[in-house]
Amino acid sequence: MARQNRFDRTSFQTQIIDLSHDGRGVARPHGEGGKVTFVTGALPGEVVIVEPVARNRHFDEARVVEVLQASPQRVIPRCSHFGVCSGCVLQHLAEDAQVVSKQRVLLESLERIGCVSPERVLPALAAESWGYRRKGRFSVRWVEKKGRTLVGFREHDPRFVADVSVCHTVVPQVGEKIALLATLLDSLDGRCDVPQIEFIAGDAVVALTVRHLQPLSEADRLALIEFGKEHGIAIFLQSGGVESVRLLWPDEVLLAFRLKPWDVEFVFRPLDFIQINGGLNEKMIAHALDLLGAGFGERVLDLFCGLGNFTLPLARTVGEVVGVEGDIGLVERARENARRNGLGNAEFFVADLTRDQRDAPWMRQGFDKLLLDPPRSGAIEVLKQLPLKMFERIVYVSCHPGSLARDADFLVNEQGFVLRAVGAMDMFPHTAHVESIAVFDRC
């Protein structure tokens, strides 16, 4: 006997009252006290017809079938793949409204999770919203039914690769060549052995790193070289872990970007972490240094420093700066970049900041101010170990409002700091990702 549907999939009309933290519309079709329904593709204030797609204990999920009354902030998505590809979720919302929404998510998270409110809300930072992604990873899959290779981000259903020919958020040197890249992979003998391609862009060079599960034939290597020559793209191969990455073409290449306001150049490797949005990154650094307010006579501790994205600009403006990072490769590059830029007042240490560091040499040094830029999980482990009373000011750059709110709760409600200011930064336009910056002062 055929399996019965577990819930009623009949379409119905509803009004959208809010936007969720992941970019979906929020409806309460059963009234104020009823279960919430998250609606993909809907915006606040809209009246829509929706089709249920999933039912959960505490909430339901649906998708828009028809918009009966559109929001004045609704715009036509630039990408024809919007709604299928998971790379963007907010292209149907005007760009200024996206930023307002992210600012709201940030403030709501601080209040709801951290039980804190800032004295001042900083104007949100934004930069170029198209062609900004200078680092990313495309999935690759040969699809027998289509008879061709798909290259792109995953669909919202992560089992599938989005069938795209162009991506408007990726740097044009890569985003406009996805179809050509797919054609190249179609021609390879080992087309089924390439699961992903990573891209990264410096100021002068764009690089692709081709991950392959089996050794590539000489013909395949030559095809990749010809593609690199034709389009001016450096080609790297990766047969295993990060340590297996090798340059295929050209014979030598220098991946680098310069932060002109501080006359600092960063040299990096193809799989290194760099901030995805170069234009916003420069604004963010200037904003963070201005908020930190550290001068030539002061010592600054920079945690989760990576390549030294904040550390090296800080070294131009303060007496001494110490950067701490868990990735030994990034620390090696940070030290080398400090030497290349003649910054002898920047020192770097390798440390896993999720573990006990109370006996680490840098932990015993004295500092005036603290800057930190942790991963999504936040910084609670290291914050609980630091002698926080030595810091006059803390500037916290966050990539997740939930972990920032948790850490703000600790700093304000347990350690007695004051949350002076906070603001969103639109590092990832057209996505629901919320980057932010917060300023804490010692009482």
Curated annotation (Swiss-Prot):
Key word Transmembrane helix present: no
EC number of the protein: 2.1.1.190
Binding site for S-adenosyl-L-methionine: 275, 304, 309, 325, 352, 373
CDD domains in alphabetical order: AdoMet_MTases
TRAM domain sequence ranges: 4-66
InterPro entries, per the entry: 23S_rRNA_MeTrfase_RlmD, MeTrfase_TrmA_AS, MeTrfase_TrmA_CS, NA-bd_OB-fold, SAM-dependent_MTases_sf, TRAM_dom, U5_MeTrfase_fam
UniProt: [4Fe-4S] cluster binding residues: 79, 85, 88, 167
GO function term, MF aspect, one: RNA binding
Catalytic activity: uridine(1939) in 23S rRNA + S-adenosyl-L-methionine = 5-methyluridine(1939) in 23S rRNA + S-adenosyl-L-homocysteine + H(+)
Protein known as: 23S rRNA (uracil(1939)-C(5))-methyltransferase RlmD
Source species: Xylella fastidiosa (strain Temecula1 / ATCC 700964)
Gene it is expressed from: rlmD
